[in-house]
Amino acid sequence: MNRRLRLLAVAAFLAAWPAAARPAPLAPRRYELDLAVDFKEERIAGSARITLENTGASALSEASFLLYRLLTVTAVRGSDGAPLAFSHNVVAFEDDPKRQANQVRVLLTPPLEPGASAVVEIAYGGYLAGYVETGALYIQDRVDEAFTILREDADAYPTVRAPSFESIRAAPPPEFDYVARINVPESHVVANGGELVERTVRDGRATYVYRNLRPAWRMDFAIARFRTLEAPGLRVFALPQDTAGAERVLRAAGACMALFRGWFGPLQDAPAFTIIEIPDGWGSQADVTSILQAAAAFRDPGQMHELYHEISHLWNVPARDASFCRWNEGLAAFLEALAAEKLDGTPTLDAQAEKVARRLRERAAEDPRLRTVPMIDYGKAGMTGDSYRTGMLMFYALYRLAGPEAFNAIVGGYYREHQARGGTTADFVRRSETIGGPGVAPLFQDWLFTTHWLDILASGAKVRELANRYRP
């Protein structure tokens, strides 16, 4: 059988794989991303060279990647440049039929042995149109000269996973290095939380080369006519109409980071930190060295608490739980309110906790699962959005029960002990119970491991008195 027929036969085999194939234990260890952005045609094109490691116990003969449904794969090659057999088909997520992606299935030849690594280079191009129709309202990603963002939320680059939210939640978060070359018109700036290695200009186009500062779990590249502001250890990319607000954001970020350092200790191996402005409604979020911050914080001083929320995530550790319930979002929601009270000088923490309690009671009427699914299982149940509120009240009660000094020792000590290798919910609970006193165990029993918290709220208990339930 000649080479062409052999490749066709293998491709036919790949096309016959079941759509619900589960992800193999493949971990991305390095990305080399090379993309050009064409505003006139509203498309991107380029390649992603991905180093994969088999973290499992048996050899693997295939890999599954996801791309946005309007991105087309033109070639797949190995480390030596030889073509690899592949198929790519637009498929629906098995647990969310509204969500569609281009699943790229690649045959690994020879099979990848346990502990071994291989390189897969995927050439692709096409369009982005977001995922708003799926209910993910913040994923409005598209190629537009006013603002463009390339991120994993919209599958703008190949991610190593299968089309199943259950399997994605169950997998540990990736950790990888990256080098990215993003080519844009000279008038535009590419913003990223990594180190800018170089910027070169040729024929009216600029190529920005970034590399990560710390092991990354995602890559975000925002493109606009940004203005850049810098201070020691901080960098802000602001949309051109918000330059004045960027000065305020820079000052507030510095004050907030100083506050958290005083509470939890310094960030370990702290690199320069980057804040990137994005339009409202596009989803503020943080990674290990940067924040995507919605424009509201740049335009309205009253919305600066959103920035405090994202900055608090810098003191998170990599979660090692399977199907993590994301209680760290509840911690961030609490620290957001606490920092706003301390930095703004107005006593708003108790009022914010009361507001969250009212909304939780409303949510329980809307979603009966809250009556039966404890927060520890929110990840398995696809309910992590509820961790923001349930977790906020849990940490509010813990803070009032243990007191500020013990609370800071819990959070800061957990960060210092587990930042390098990650930690689990069980690790955090053990530390909290050791430092926080005898009332912490029943508090976690009510708020984390059972749904008794709902009975407490339904009884009309005052939120300001929650901690009293757990005092000796």
PLM-predicted stretches and their roles:
Residues 104, 119-220, 224:
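Extended, low-hydrophobicity, Ser/Thr/Pro/Gly-biased non-transmembrane segments
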Residues 70-140:
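A surface-exposed beta-strand-loop module
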Residues 1-9:
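Bacterial N-terminal signal peptides that target proteins for export
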Residues 180, 209, 226-327, 335:
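Juxtacatalytic substrate-recognition/specificity segment
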Residues 8-16:
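Bacterial N-terminal signal peptides
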Residues 6, 19-45, 74, 172, ...:
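N-terminal, polar/Ser/Thr-rich
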Residues 51-71, 166-185, 426:
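Surface-exposed beta-strand/loop patches in extracellular or lumenal glycoproteins
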Residues 325, 329-397, 401, 418-419, ...:
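Acidic/His/Gly-enriched intrinsically disordered linker/tail segments
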